[in-house]
Amino acid sequence: MNKKILFLGVGGIGVSALAIAAKRLGAHVAGYDSVANKLTAKLEALGIVIFTSPNGVDVANFDIVVYSSAILSSHPLLSQARSLGIQCLQRAMFLSVLMKDFSYSIAITGTHGKTTTSSVLATLLCQLDKYSSFIVGGVVKYADSNIQVNGTDKLVIEADESDASFLFLSPQVVIITNIDLDHMATYNNSYQTLLENFTDFVSKESVKSIYLCVDDQGCRDLLAKYNQSDKNVTSYGFSIDADVQIYDYHIIDEITHFKIRYKGDDLSFKLQLPGRYNVQNATACIIACLDLGFKYEDIRNALIKVTGVARRFDLYTKVISGHQVTVIDDYGHHPVEVANSISAVRDRYPNKKIIHVFQPHRYTRNRDLIKDWPKALSLADQLILLPTYSADEQIIKGAESQDIVKGLSGYLLADGFDHAIYFLEKLANENTVILIQGAGDVTNLVEILSE
């Protein structure tokens, strides 16, 4: 990749990964972000020049400008690049360009679990094939990074459906974890439009193999809608009609055990990640690796080393009011993700009381899923509900935190982190496990607990 590329919004995890990948593939790279952070410091340590002011950036010196969704079209650097006729590419559009440098790419998409599934497959392939690479939307714990370029053989990517940008991508393999109602403004609040976009994605000429979880109704709807016979379509899940069925799921000493029935063979696996949903995610990756020709024993040995992705069921032990308490930090922010996480906590800690500290994320999500929240938020033994993290949205009347628990009783409404800690100090002991959850800044509560 012999190009000079300027990355705008390079302090974000997605664009920073592309900048690193481009540099390792031979491009001359520079970046801009209005605020320096740990990611920009990492880029500078790799020899990438970082600008924090538009002043001094010679846009005319670049062949391509790549920008994140956080960069407005009116941004002076982007406007200048366009006026100069420089090629300007949104993040996913540039990823599609980058993919051409690799001989084989696998895209993971879906409403929930795509980052975790991407991290599982990335961890497996980096052990099974030293020339495999990945670019995903979270920090893969195995590599302590969201990006690794080891060669140009196989590339694992996370394909984002939230803004329909996955339609820019042309992979050879697609894994779909599920199709659910979220980010529906992208799809004009139409489930059929959402399905049509997924259909368009898997119908691309480049796609040869598709893996779908048939435990999910959205994936079943896609299968019913999809009628092309020129691709290898494999369904997986606990369902008895799955092409690859999962069974014998159980936990021993906090290790997840399960089996799959693959082409007539019964194969057993162990996984450090908790919950049925992570078994589903792992199964998709296992099948993809088996179909690529990797040996069962090698996959089995690699899978037990998978530790997932940062902020997905991260485990800590904290001293709270003199008690040693297990605390889990999790990114889940949709009713389905909340329900899955609480189920996983129950499976792993069947004899402990679950205290769920939840920070809703976006008023629009509260509003759009208002009927689904009460059931999901009733599943723990005790709910502590924080104010909604706005993500720069305006408050929507009838869609605040107290509105998503209408009909529930016994929950505690905290007005902030200090108030939540006050409740935790009263409630927590060795017989409790605390699940701190949300996509906003609630992860900071984990750090505060240790102070």
Swiss-Prot record:
GO CC, sorted alphabetically, is: cytoplasm
Q: Name the gene.
A: murC
Disulfides per UniProt:
none
Binding locations of ATP: 110-116
Q: What is this protein called?
A: UDP-N-acetylmuramate--L-alanine ligase
State the species of origin.
Francisella tularensis subsp. mediasiatica (strain FSC147)
Q: Name one GO biological process term.
A: cell division
Catalysis performed (reactions): UDP-N-acetyl-alpha-D-muramate + L-alanine + ATP = UDP-N-acetyl-alpha-D-muramoyl-L-alanine + ADP + phosphate + H(+)
**PANTHER family linked:** UDP-N-ACETYLMURAMATE--L-ALANINE LIGASE, UDP-N-ACETYLMURAMATE--L-ALANINE LIGASE-RELATED
**Segments crossing the lipid bilayer:** none
Q: In which pathway does it act?
A: Cell wall biogenesis; peptidoglycan biosynthesis
Which InterPro entries does the record match to this protein? Answer: Mur-like_cat_sf, Mur_ligase_C, Mur_ligase_C_dom_sf, Mur_ligase_cen, Mur_ligase_N, MurCDEF_pg_biosynth, UDP-N-AcMur_Ala_ligase_MurC
Spell out the Pfam families in the cross-references: Mur_ligase (PF01225), Mur_ligase_C (PF02875), Mur_ligase_M (PF08245)
Protein's cellular compartments: Cytoplasm
Q: Which GO terms describe its molecular function?
A: ATP binding; UDP-N-acetylmuramate-L-alanine ligase activity
